[in-house]
Amino acid sequence: MFNIKELMEVTEARKLNDFKIDDNKTFVISTDTRVINKNNVYLPLVGEKFDGHSFIENAIKNSDVEVYFTNNEKYNFKNALGLLVKDTKEAYLKLAKYYKDKINPITIAVTGSCGKTTTKEMLYSVLSQKYKTHKTKLNHNNEIGFAQTIFSLKPDVQILIVEMGMRGLNEIDLIVKYANPNYSIITNVLTAHIGRLGSRENIAKAKCEVTHYMKEPKTAIVNNDPIILENITDKNINVITFDINSPNLKIISQEESKSVFEYKNNLYKLNIEGVYNIQNALSAIELGLILKLSPKEIANGLEEFKPFGMRWNVEKYNDNKLTIVNDCYNANPDSMKAAIKTFFEIYKNKKNVLVLGDMGELGENEIVYHRELGEFLNNFEFDTLITIGHLAKNINIASKNKNKIHFNDLNECKNYIFDKIKEGNVLIKASRSMEFEKLTEGVAK
């Protein structure tokens, strides 16, 4: 992947000793000494709670690695070459950019408050119909995940899809500095991370960083929301909008695990319900058309997309009498309301139960947001409300539902669900920190 000349020039490294390396030998970057060998360069990353430098001395003693990066001159590299850099993470990102530029795939950056992972997966399913496509694994959406994604690229990749997350300003800016996307997608700007950023305006600024450092054709495909459009500061960017209220969109039907809609006179099907999932699909359609896919290829890609990873997974129990919609990957006030609305649109006139937990990172107004959600529930008739967590108790208090229960313990709630609810439909949703996946773990389907 890299010869010694490239390693030094790209990272602006300085040799700490005179250990000789064959100029023609190539090395692969590794950040983990547990799986390292002679063909690897060890690059120790430094984080808030870890420092890869603490493993260097053990690696020197117990491995045959020939090249080490470091930000510290103290190490004695007797039988290996030490390369000194100011910042090992910066060196990691520079090497990733260099390798990406050699392959030169069309690069697509995806961000948003909600739906970015789903959109990335839809894009991958669509664009793979025509191109050799690579994507960020799961939700490895920070700068380290970006570099790991790049180093897993194969030379024949034509399109790269990079998901970009953030918990504050300038975090996406750091990733796009090295990613240089040709296309950027913003799914939406909602209340996720409002506790950290303080306002929706700041969230929009952070998300719109995905339009920085773009390469031609410098095209942003974004939700038609004024707060997004106002925060795209580069006026040379070609902006294309998508809108769930577009006159070009006609939602034909939604039922369990199926949505059918028409967009720009073409019919599309998804194996998942929810207006917000149709909205996610619109950005994939728009980019597919730009990249010369036919409507049929796009339709095939969308139909092949499958829900994944605690994102609206429909699970059946008790001989199909009990349906649990597992949407517990994460939650904020907007995604909660959208999921609840979809749940009641799909599952009508049956015994419906909501199991809701704490929503995190909402800042000083966290109690208000939870009470507002409880009041929102008063728009619907349903059987039982179950809440878990000290914040979710405020949902319970604000709800006027006659049947409501609050638990402080996941196992108690799990036992109640499977002991008391034998049929009907259950939606489970909470922030990732609540670990709601444990509510269905180990239960026979």
Where are the model-predicted features located?
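Active-site beta-alpha connecting loops in nucleotide-dependent enzymes
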Residues: G47-F50, F308, C328-K400
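Acidic, Mg2+-coordinating active-site environments of NTP-dependent enzymes
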Residues: E6, V10-T11, E73-K78, I185-T323, ...
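Mobile, glycine- and charge-enriched loop segments
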Residues: K38-L43, T133-H134, I144, Q148-L160, ...
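N-terminal leader/targeting and accessory segments in enzymes
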Residues: M1-K94, I346-Y347, E375-K393, N401, ...
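ATP-dependent carboxylate/acyl-activation modules
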Residues: V110, M310-R311, S433, E437-L439
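Residue-level signal for inorganic ion chemistry
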Residues: L7, N40, A59, L95, ...
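Phosphate-binding loop of NTP-binding sites
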Residues: K5-T11, E90-N224, I228-N236, G288-L291, ...
